[in-house]
Structures are given as C-alpha cells and as structure tokens.
C-alpha cells in the first residue's frame, strides 16, 4: 500500500461506489466550491499494491498563522470497518502533514457510531463503534465528544434517515404515523404540485428560506453560500418547490361540489326516506357546507395573493450513496396546504424512481427530550419512521505543536476580550 496524492479522476471514480457511504462534501464538485471560497484543495488517499485506490479524502487547506489547517469535511472515504486500513491511513496522513506546513488537522468522517430506531432504541445486534474512536485517539487525535447539541463549528452528528431498500412508496407510507399520512393525503387532495427550480428561479427558494429564518431564528446562510453550490454541483443539487394553483383547485372544488349537490338532490327527491338515507343526506349537507366555505376562501385568496402560491422549497444533494435534505423553508401563511409534506413525499418518490436506497432528512441535535431546541424537528422526522444514525464526531490533531499552542492561546485571549 502507499499513501499518495490523487488525481481528480482517481478520486471521483473511487467515491462513486455507493457501498463506501460517501457524503456530498466528498465529491469532485466540492473542489471548485472550496476553491471559490478561497481555499486550496488537495486530494489524498491510499492505493493498494495493484495501484487501485482504496481510500480517498478531499482536504481544504485553510491558511492560518503562516501554516494551514487541513480539513477533510466528512472525510476520509473508505471501508471504515477495516481498522487496519484506517490505522495505516492515519499514520501516513500524519507523515504527509508534517511535510506540508500543517498547523492542525480536522476530520469529521461520515462514519456510523451507533444506530437507533425512531424512539432512540438501539438496533438489536448493533454495537457502538468505540473501536474507531479509540483508534483515532491512539494516533493523538482529540475527540470533540459525543455531542447532543448543534454547534456552528461542527457538522451535525445525528441524522434521521429513511432506509428505502426493499420497500415501495406504498409499503413505506404505511409505516408513517397517522399525522404524516393524513397531511400527505391532504396535500394530494388540495392538488399541491412539486417542480424543480432552475438557477434563475432560485430566488423563490430564498424567499421561503428567509421567511423561515426570520420566524424560527436559526443561524442562516448567505445567498452567495447557496449560489456557490448551485453553480458548482450541477445536477447533484436539486431544488424542489411545492406550490398550489388556486385556479385548478377552485375548478376541482366546484366540480366536487356540483357532484355532491346533485347526489343530495337525487336522494331528497325520493319518498319515504329511511333513517340511513337521512343520515347520508345530513353527511352530504356537511360536506357541501365545507366545500362552499373552502371555495369561498380559495377564491378570495386567489384575488389577494394570486393564483400560484409557493408553499415550500428545499435544497437537496444527490450523490452515489443517497439523497440528502440540506436546507429548506416554507410559508406559514399557507401551511394549511401542507407544502413541506408534499415536498418530502415527492423527493422520497424521486429516490424510488432513481434507484436510491436512502432518503436522508439529515440533521438532529441528539437531544431528544421535550425541552430540546429541535424537539419539533425530531417529532416531524420521527413521524416518517426514520432510523436515527449517530456519527462518530469530530477529531482534531495538532501537527506543528508549538505553533498550535500559540494559536489556541491567542484564540482564548480573543474570546476573553470579546466577553
């Protein structure tokens, strides 16, 4: 085996293998994204004795104090069950970094630590991957910990994932809780549609994202941050928009209303109606009253807000391994139409149609108590019967130890001065 720099082609060919469970940050498209952010990129990996790539990682080189922080965002990519391979990688990486002006290195691999069901009950027969964590520590890495909160300096450590293997949309939907099924069906009955946005329409996503940002108070990303991905990831970034055409909805409602009124009139015309028939008439009267109310509201909304209402939108990444929900927004004013539910249902079906076995709702804090900052997000994802995946976390290692001590000391002083 040998540790070496890789070409873009070598790197790309390797990470395209879905069995390696790579992340959307460990793809060739992210090279240009990181370069656009002003960072150099280096591709490092291992080749076996037949010159075949068996490990790969995309590193950003972040200039710091005359040296570089080497950060492999969600790397490296390899068969992490092969502890001997991981051991060799970490040993050889250390040698490489000592020769290439590294201040310290950060790794946050897309590697599983533990697996749970939606209620945070560990899967039977699964064990915590402490062997990997201990292996990193044996190479001098500091573990950032088994965190259970969001941290702006770290990638998420907990995820909610739908395993689609061996399922169909119909069988999968049966595993959702009653609220998820009901709200998806509501959106379908409203006639909510979903389409993918082009780059020149991306402002429609941003409008919904900014509205949600203001409402929820989360840490937002800039427009340029999103456009950087849109411009570099090509067809690996997907932006669905859930919307409703009120003109079509009003027409559908009117047709249904006419049908119910005709049925009611026919039943009323019969003589000697039974109690059962009278109950049916009463039920139809309720439905007619409801539809008339809906028709009036939809007509008024169309006059004030226009016939097309944008309900929800999201940014997704698709790579060889999965489709991953990255970020999204929705309109609170139109939440009756269940736009987010339709968007997720559409994208789940996209996975089935395009051969993906994983639909990743992505981030959770890891605090699943009712007082947690994202308990509502957890409940939403839990309702889809997700499996909860816990990743092994962040690892740091100083390479230039004297300069790293100075760097951390100055950083602590800066933080004290800010306070």
From Swiss-Prot:
One of the GO BP terms on file: peptidoglycan biosynthetic process
Enzyme class name: transferase
Record EC number: 2.3.2.18
Compartments it resides in: Cytoplasm
Molecular function GO labels: aminoacyltransferase activity
Keywords on record: Acyltransferase, Cell shape, Cell wall biogenesis/degradation, Cytoplasm, Peptidoglycan synthesis, Transferase
Record-stated family: Belongs to the FemABX family.
Complex and partners: Homodimer. Interacts with FemA.
Protein name per Swiss-Prot or TrEMBL: Aminoacyltransferase FemB
Organism: Staphylococcus aureus (strain bovine RF122 / ET3-1)
């Amino acid at each position: 085996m040998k540790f070496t720099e890789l070409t873009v082609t070598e790197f790309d060919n390797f990470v395209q293998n879905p069995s390696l469970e790579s992340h959307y940050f460990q793809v060739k498209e992210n090279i240009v994204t990181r370069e656009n952010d002003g960072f150099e990129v280096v591709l490092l990996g291992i080749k076996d004795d037949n010159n075949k790539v068996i490990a790969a990682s995309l590193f950003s080189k972040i200039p710091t104090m005359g040296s570089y922080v080497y950060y492999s965002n969600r790397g490296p990519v390899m068969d992490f069950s092969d502890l001997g391979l991981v051991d060799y990688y970490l040993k050889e990486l250390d040698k490489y970094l000592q020769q290439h002006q590294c201040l310290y290195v950060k790794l946050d691999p897309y590697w599983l630590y533990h697996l749970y069901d939606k209620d945070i009950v560990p899967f039977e027969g699964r064990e915590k991957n402490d062997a990997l964590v201990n292996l990193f520590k044996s190479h001098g890495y500091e573990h950032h910990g088994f965190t259970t909160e969001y941290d702006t300096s770290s990638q998420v450590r907990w995820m909610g994932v739908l395993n689609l293997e061996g399922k169909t949309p119909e069988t999968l939907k049966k595993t959702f809780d009653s609220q998820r099924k009901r709200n998806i069906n509501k959106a379908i009955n409203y006639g909510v549609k979903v389409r993918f946005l082009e780059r020149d329409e991306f402002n429609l996503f941003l409008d919904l994202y900014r509205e949600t940002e203001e409402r929820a108070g989360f840490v937002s990303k800039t427009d340029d941050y999103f456009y950087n991905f849109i411009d570099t990831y090509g067809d690996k970034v997907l932006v669905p928009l859930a919307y409703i055409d009120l003109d079509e909805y009003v027409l559908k409602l009117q047709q249904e209303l006419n049908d119910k009124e005709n049925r009611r009139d026919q039943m009323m015309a019969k003589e000697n109606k039974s109690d059962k028939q009278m109950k049916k008439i009463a039920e139809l009267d309720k439905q007619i009253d409801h539809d008339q109310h809906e028709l009036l509201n939809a007509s008024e909304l169309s006059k004030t807000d226009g016939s097309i209402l944008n309900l929800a939108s999201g940014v997704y990444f698709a790579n060889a391994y999965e489709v991953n929900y990255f970020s999204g927004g929705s309109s609170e004013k139109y939440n009756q139409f269940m736009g987010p539910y339709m968007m997720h249902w559409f994208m789940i079906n996209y996975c089935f149609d395009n051969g993906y076995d994983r639909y990743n709702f992505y981030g959770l804090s890891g605090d699943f108590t009712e007082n947690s900052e994202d308990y509502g997000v957890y409940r939403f994802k839990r309702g889809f019967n997700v499996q909860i995946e816990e990743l092994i976390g962040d690892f740091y290692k100083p390479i230039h130890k004297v300069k790293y001590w100075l760097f951390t000391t100055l950083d602590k002083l800066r933080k004290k001065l800010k306070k």
